Regions:
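Long, contiguous, secondary-structure-rich segments that constitute the structural scaffold
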Residues: 81-83, 87-98, 102-173
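Long, low-complexity segments enriched in small/aliphatic residues
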Residues: 1-87
Length: 173
């Protein structure tokens, strides 16, 4: 397989679906969007490939308050949230927060402990999976678990739904 084979063999006869018909490093379309869209102060759309700090990301000022970064992954026991209610799958593949042994030791967490995972968006109680298979400073929770929280009470999730911890804020694009 060769990506863009026809374009590579004859770019004149097989233009790409860009304004110039070519691979664009500078995007006229993104430049126009950046000039015409109403963006929040911390939202950036750049016509050139450029690093832009993400919100809720590694360099967010809230990191001083919440030092561990949380990431989600597709879990082997579910397809998104489908099959999240199947008992045998829940037993075979329990919902856990992955944490590096260095971070776990600093917090007095042992494998299997129920831990409180929280940030400014929400909180959950979930079992800890202490493993060197995740980097120090990073935690991970499989996505797709069903929410089990009293949303009219304490709002603490007991099902391991990563969505309780996200801002639900879309990126500018």
């Amino acid at each position: 397989y060769v990506a863009f084979r026809a374009f590579r063999e004859d770019p004149q006869a097989n233009p790409l679906k860009t304004p110039s018909g070519k691979i664009e490093i500078y995007s006229e379309r993104l430049a126009k969007i950046a000039d015409t869209w109403e963006l929040k102060k911390d939202e950036i759309i750049h016509p050139l490939p450029a690093y832009t700090p993400g919100f809720d990301g590694w360099d967010d000022p809230l990191r001083k308050t919440y030092p561990l970064q949380l990431t989600g992954f597709h879990y082997k026991a579910r397809t998104h949230s489908s099959y999240g209610n199947i008992d045998v799958l829940q037993q075979a593949c329990p919902q856990e927060v992955w944490i590096n042994p260095i971070d776990a030791q600093a917090r007095g967490i042992r494998h299997g402990d129920t831990v409180r995972v929280f940030n400014n968006n929400g909180e959950m109680l979930i079992a800890a999976k202490v493993t060197p298979r995740i980097l120090p400073g990073v935690t991970a929770i499989g996505q797709g678990a069903w929410l089990k929280a009293d949303m009219f009470g304490d709002r603490v999730d007991h099902g391991g739904s990563i969505n309780i911890l996200t801002s639900h804020r879309p990126s500018p694009l």
